[in-house]
């Protein structure tokens, strides 16, 4: 008799019967059926393993730089032998392009790369390589979806393989399970087998993975725990910018970003994203300001845009693109309570130019400056940048890495820095503010 249980695709919790909501993580509609294989052999006897000392010899983790500098930045300097990297993103965002550019670049002359696709045929891969001008390098390619066949093919050539690309993990299946491709059990089992094999043989493995409509990696949450590094490819299909961001990295920092521009010949690195994001900006535009932000260790200048429209609705709309909508509501409440700027009868729209997403609390001051400018009809001072966190009392608080933010702004020609007076900076071009009342006086 076939046995089955039910597993949550969000957290991996297993339950004996189906329910509409996971009792462990509370997510609705995440419970899926999983067939338990009845021919598994349970081995109860283990083998002894030797202990090691925490103070014992450490094998140095050598980094292998790739030809893609922005990719190296996100990883923390390059690839580490035996590491497993998961790259997620919407379909068509550029994951396959990035992986093919990596595997079929001059990197392939130093490392033996194998590109395995379960989504395309070999001819389709070759045609894409021709379009991206990547046919000069002798990279091995394989079109396969069966896990056992893939591992057997790698095993036969493992002495000539240093890096494996799997595009994508959702298409790989194992004969041990009867469930269809892309299910929780298939993804978990196949990913676990591939990652373990790669680590045992000191091979670098890169797995691509689709994301759900909520922006989460498709498949079980355990997939993120199996790998050493989790990267997300962010961007809008209507925008040519792409952001590669690290969310987990055992060999480097978290939150680092790499910026790319999608072109007809593939992904192009953007080494100075601040200049590119501000290239088409006009001066003295009402409702816009420049935020001096930090993404990982990289300073980045971004344009914040605000628009207000009179509304007859009982509850006017508040919309934020690239920024937290709840934080926008908080800032509007502080403006109303602390400086008497009542926006209850206005629709408020906020957008971060270039398709970027900001989570830095230091963006509060730039957002508030744009809102005050849009509400009063007065532009912010020319050639000015803003950074600072706003408290519920309306005070402007100091932020991390102020010097780094200022240097990036000065490098791009901005000569007026508006930040908290608690930064204790003595530059002549700094206008210190301690409260929202001071900011309102500047924008008039």
UniProtKB/Swiss-Prot annotation:
Cell division recorded as keyword: no
Cell wall biogenesis/degradation is among the record's keywords: no
Binding site for ATP: 89-96
Molecular function, one GO term: ATP hydrolysis activity
Sections of the chain in a coiled coil: none
Gene Ontology BP annotations: recombinational repair
Any Pfam family hit: ChlI
Region (Lon-protease-like): 347-444
Renumbered ranges of motif RadA KNRFG motif: 248-252
Stretches annotated zinc finger (C4-type): 8-25
Any one GO cellular component localisation term in the record: cytosol
Keywords of this entry: ATP-binding, DNA damage, DNA repair, DNA-binding, Hydrolase, Metal-binding, Nucleotide-binding, Stress response, Zinc, Zinc-finger
Known EC number: 3.6.4.-
Function of the molecule: DNA-dependent ATPase involved in processing of recombination intermediates, plays a role in repairing DNA breaks. Stimulates the branch migration of RecA-mediated strand transfer reactions, allowing the 3' invading strand to extend heteroduplex DNA faster. Binds ssDNA in the presence of ADP but not other nucleotides, has ATPase activity that is stimulated by ssDNA and various branched DNA structures, but inhibited by SSB. Does not have RecA's homology-searching function.
HAMAP family xref list: RadA_bact
Domains (record comment): Has a putative N-terminal zinc-finger, a middle region with homology to RecA with ATPase motifs including the RadA KNRFG motif, while the C-terminus is homologous to Lon protease.
Family label: Belongs to the RecA family. RadA subfamily.
Name used for this protein in its record: DNA repair protein RadA
Organism: Rickettsia conorii (strain ATCC VR-613 / Malish 7)
UniProt gene name: radA
